[in-house]
Amino acid sequence: MTNRPPPDGSNRPIQLSSEAALDALCADADRVLVEFYTDGCGICSSMEPVLGNLARQLDIAVAQVNPRDDPPLVERFDVRSVPLFVLFVDGDPVARLADGFVPGAELESWVREHSG
């Protein structure tokens, strides 16, 4: 397995539109950080550059998914508030964080702590 940047070569988060797309990405990458967000969430929008920087610094796949696009995601990941960050290692969710805006250094430490 490998981590891969988005197809356009940027470090912007990969936009996922379904549970199947999320599962495929998690199966394909060693480590994946997913932000669950909703349209109109200002904090969620402000996290995008932080996530892009994190992808570059940690060589990790970073994605965003709106659970409203695929409602079973809400139940599967117990999404109660956004942004919700879920870290996957080898396809399995290993940690979750739902603390609003998370500064880059804090999010980087959290990813390192939970991904070995």
Predicted feature residues:
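The canonical Cys-X-X-Cys-His
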Residues: C41-C44, F85
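Short active-site neighborhood of thiol/selenol oxidoreductases, capturing the structured segment around
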Residues: A27-D39
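Hydrophobic beta-strand anchors of alpha/beta hydrolase catalytic cores
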Residues: L33-V34, V62, F85
